[in-house]
A protein has these predicted regions:
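Structural beta-alpha unit
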Residues: 45-79
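Intrinsically disordered or low-complexity boundary/linker segments at protein termini
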Residues: 16-20, 78, 104-113
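Small/aliphatic-rich secondary-structure junction motif
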Residues: 1-22, 46, 50-55
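Short secondary-structure boundary segments
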Residues: 11-13, 82-84, 113
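Short, well-ordered secondary-structure micro-motifs
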Residues: 18-21, 68-69, 91-93
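A short acidic, glycine-rich active-site loop
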Residues: 25-38
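Glycine-rich, Arg-bearing micro-motifs that act as flexible, cationic patches
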Residues: 78-103
């Protein structure tokens, strides 16, 4: 970790248009910030204990394609991501973020369960 940089990325799915339209811009930004903090705070705490200070990115969009796109743009050496394991039926109906990242990402991907 001494000569490597680390990026911690979270991608929130966009809210449906009818929900976005019902919120002010400030409310939408506050919601996105709160949801991002829920995801990132425990990870940042864990990484800090191991003296890792990552660059943090937060985006809104389709998680699978956005993760792959950012990995390509930022020239990541590897993507390490969790797999929530929705099961075969969940993947069939919705597709998993991990599956979409694997399909769209030219960067090596390590899935952690």
């Amino acid at each position: 970790t001494h000569n490597q940089s680390h990026t911690l990325l979270t991608v929130l799915p966009a809210l449906p248009a009818r929900v976005r339209n019902a919120l002010s811009k400030e409310q939408l930004l506050q919601y996105q910030a709160e949801e991002t903090d829920k995801v990132l705070e425990p990870v940042l705490t864990y990484l800090a204990r191991h003296d890792i200070r990552p660059h943090v990115l937060s985006r809104v969009g389709d998680p699978g394609s956005t993760i792959a796109e950012i990995a390509r743009e930022e020239k990541f050496g590897m993507v390490i991501m969790g797999s929530h394991g929705q099961g075969a039926l969940g993947n069939l109906l919705m597709g998993s973020v991990a599956t979409r990242v694997l399909a769209n990402c030219s960067t090596p991907v390590l899935l952690v369960r």
